[in-house]
C-alpha cells in the first residue's frame, strides 16, 4: 500500500520530488492525450475489418455518408457511449449543407450493427429535439439491425424516446429520412415519422423480415418483394427511390434545397437571370399538338409534366412520389427563384381520375406545403373521381374528403390554372374560388361543366330522345342495323359537338366570376409567376395555430 505523504508539494524543497513523479504539466499532457483518444474513438467505429465488411456489401460507413452531404468539418454532438459500447452505434452532429445548418443522425453499422439501446435512443431523441428547438432541418441516415437484444427493454425504451421526439418536431422542422441496409421493426417506424423517406435499391425496411414472415405465415418471400423500394414506392411508404446510396444522398440534398428551415420561414429563394415575362413558345406548341391530334382531339391523354416543364425555371422540377398514383403529379419547382409546390392532374394515367391513392398522395403533399409556407399551384385537367365498387371499398369518399379538407385548409398563396377538363365535384374541390383559391385562371382549352360530353342527354333531352326514336323507326322499317347505327352515331356526334361548343368552355365560368381571366397559350408562366410574386410580397410566413403535424 502506497504511503501517504504529508509534505507540502508546493514547498520549493519538494519541487524536485514532484517533477520526478508526475508534474502538473505531465498530468495535463496526459489529459490532452486522453481527450484526443476520446475525440477520435467514434471515427474508428468498429475497426478496419468491420469497415471492409460494410464496403463488401456495397454500403458506405456513416462517416463516408456525412462526407457526401458536406465538405465542411461536421460538428459532432453527443459523443457519449458506455463501457459496453452503449450509444456508440449512433453518430449525431450539425452539418453545413450549402450554407445551412442541418441536424443529422446516422447509425454506425460497424458498431454492434447500429442496434438500438437506451443510450442510443436518448442520443437520437436529444438530437431530434435540438433540431426542433433551434429551427433547423433534420436528416436521418438509418442503417440499423433494430433493438439490441442484450439491452432488454432498454432497447425498446430507446425507440420509444425517439418516437416521441420525432412526433414533437413534426410540422415544426422538415425532416428527410434515408434508408440504408436492412431496417426492421422500430427501425422502420422511426424514419417513416419523417416528412420524406428516400430508399435506394438493394435495401429493405419493414415491420418484420422475410424469415419472420416465413415462420409465422408460411409465406416464402424475398426481402425485396416484402420491403424493397418497388413495394414501398407504390404504396407511398417511401417518397423517393434511388439507384444507390450516393444517389439517395444527392436526392436528399436536392430535396433540402426546396425546403425551409422551419415553419416560421420560407424556402430559400434562388437568384436567377430568367424573366417571368417572356413568351414561352414551347408551351404553345405543346398545347397545339395535343389538342389538334387528328385521332383523339380534345380527348388526347396529356402528360401534365410536359406542361409543368414549361412553367418552372430552366424546366427543372423535383417530383415527389413519382411511382404512386401517377394520375396525380406532385412536385417542387421554382418560378422566378421562388419555390412552388405543384399539384397536377395527369390524364396520361387512368384518365387523370382521382382515386383513393391519388387523394391521399395529394392531401399529404398539400398539408406539407401548408405547414412550411410553400405556395401551391394547381394544374387542373380532371373529369372526376374514379367510380366503381373497388374504389368504394377502398374508401374513396373518406380519402376524397381528406384531399378536400387539405385544400380548404390552405393558408399559403394558391393559384389554379384550368388546362382542359374541370367537371363536377372534382372542379368544386380543386382549389376553386369558393374553396379559397386566390386566383383561378383558364386556358382557352378549358372545359368547365357539371358533366363531360355525357351531359348532352340531360341538356338536350328532346334532341337526344329524337335520335334514339329515329334509330328505332329505321330498324322497324327494315333498314339494316348497321346503316341505322351509322345514322344514329352521326347525329350523336353532332349533338356532342354542339354540347362542347355551347357548354364545355370557360365562357360561363368567366361570366360568373368563377374564373378571373383567360390565359393564352405561351403566357402561362408569365401570368402564374407574376401573380405568385404579388401574393408572396403580401404573405407573412408563420407557424399554423395550435399543434399541426405532417
Model-found features: residue ranges?
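Ligand-binding clefts of soluble mixed alpha/beta catalytic domains
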Residues: 1-550
Amino acid at each position: 500500500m502506497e504511503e501517504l505523504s504529508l509534505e507540502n508539494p508546493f514547498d520549493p524543497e519538494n519541487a524536485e520530488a514532484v517533477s520526478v513523479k508526475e508534474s502538473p504539466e505531465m498530468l495535463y499532457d496526459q489529459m490532452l492525450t486522453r481527450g484526443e483518444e476520446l475525440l477520435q474513438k467514434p471515427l474508428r467505429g468498429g475497426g478496419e475489418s468491420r469497415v471492409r465488411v460494410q464496403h463488401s456489401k456495397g454500403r458506405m460507413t456513416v462517416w463516408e455518408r456525412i462526407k457526401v452531404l458536406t465538405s465542411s468539418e461536421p460538428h459532432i454532438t453527443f459523443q457519449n457511449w458506455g463501457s459496453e459500447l452503449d450509444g456508440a452505434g449512433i453518430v449525431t452532429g450539425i452539418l453545413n449543407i450549402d450554407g445551412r445548418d442541418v441536424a443529422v443522425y446516422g447509425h454506425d453499422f460497424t458498431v454492434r450493427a447500429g442496434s438500438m439501446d437506451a443510450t442510443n435512443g436518448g442520443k437520437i431523441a436529444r438530437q431530434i429535439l435540438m433540431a426542433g428547438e433551434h429551427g433547423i432541418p433534420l436528416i436521418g441516415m438509418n442503417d440499423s439491425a433494430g433493438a439490441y437484444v442484450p439491452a432488454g427493454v432498454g432497447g425498446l425504451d430507446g425507440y420509444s424516446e425517439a418516437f416521441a421526439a420525432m412526433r414533437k418536431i413534426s410540422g415544426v422542422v422538415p425532416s428527410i429520412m434515408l434508408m440504408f441496409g436492412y431496417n426492421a421493426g422500430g427501425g422502420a417506424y422511426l424514419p417513416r415519422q419523417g416528412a420524406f423517406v428516400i430508399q435506394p435499391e438493394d435495401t429493405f425496411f419493414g415491420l418484420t423480415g422475410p424469415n419472420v414472415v416465413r415462420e409465422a405465415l408460411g409465406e416464402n418471400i424475398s426481402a425485396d418483394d416484402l420491403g424493397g423500394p418497388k413495394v414501398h414506392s407504390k404504396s407511398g411508404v417511401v417518397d423517393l427511390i434511388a439507384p444507390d446510396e450516393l444517389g439517395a444522398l444527392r436526392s436528399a440534398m436536392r430535396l433540402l434545397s426546396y425546403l425551409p428551415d422551419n415553419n416560421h420561414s420560407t424556402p430559400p429563394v434562388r437568384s436567377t437571370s430568367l424573366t417571368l415575362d417572356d413568351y414561352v413558345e414551347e408551351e404553345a406548341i405543346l398545347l397545339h399538338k395535343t389538342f389538334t391530334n387528328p385521332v383523339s382531339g380534345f380527348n388526347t391523354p396529356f402528360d401534365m409534366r410536359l406542361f409543368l416543364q414549361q412553367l418552372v425555371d430552366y424546366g427543372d422540377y423535383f417530383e415527389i412520389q413519382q411511382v404512386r398514383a401517377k394520375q396525380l403529379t406532385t412536385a417542387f419547382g421554382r418560378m422566378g427563384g421562388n419555390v412552388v409546390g405543384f399539384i397536377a392532374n395527369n390524364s396520361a394515367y387512368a384518365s387523370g381520375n382521382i382515386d383513393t391513392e391519388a387523394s391521399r398522395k395529394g392531401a399529404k403533399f398539400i398539408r406539407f406545403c401548408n405547414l412550411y409556407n410553400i405556395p401551391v399551384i394547381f394544374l387542373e385537367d380532371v373529369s372526376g373521381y374514379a367510380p366503381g365498387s373497388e374504389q368504394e371499398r377502398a374508401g374513396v369518399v373518406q380519402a376524397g374528403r381528406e384531399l378536400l379538407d387539405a385544400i380548404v385548409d390552405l393558408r399559403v398563396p394558391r393559384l389554379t390554372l384550368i388546362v382542359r377538363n374541370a367537371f363536377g365535384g372534382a372542379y368544386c374541390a380543386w382549389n376553386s374560388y369558393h374553396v379559397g383559391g386566390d386566383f383561378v385562371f383558364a386556358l382557352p382549352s378549358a372545359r368547365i361543366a357539371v358533366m363531360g360530353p355525357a351531359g348532352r342527354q340531360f341538356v338536350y333531352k328532346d334532341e337526344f330522345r329524337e335520335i334514339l326514336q329515329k334509330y328505332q323507326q329505321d330498324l322497324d322499317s327494315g333498314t339494316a342495323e348497321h346503316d341505322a347505327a351509322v345514322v344514329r352515331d352521326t347525329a350523336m356526334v353532332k349533338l356532342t359537338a354542339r354540347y362542347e361548343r355551347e357548354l364545355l368552355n370557360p365562357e360561363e365560368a368567366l361570366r360568373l366570376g368563377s374564373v378571373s381571366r383567360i390565359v393564352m397559350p405561351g403566357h402561362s408562366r408569365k401570368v402564374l409567376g407574376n401573380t405568385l410574386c404579388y401574393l408572396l410580397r403580401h404573405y407573412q410566413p408563420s407557424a399554423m395555430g395550435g399543434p399541426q403535424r405532417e
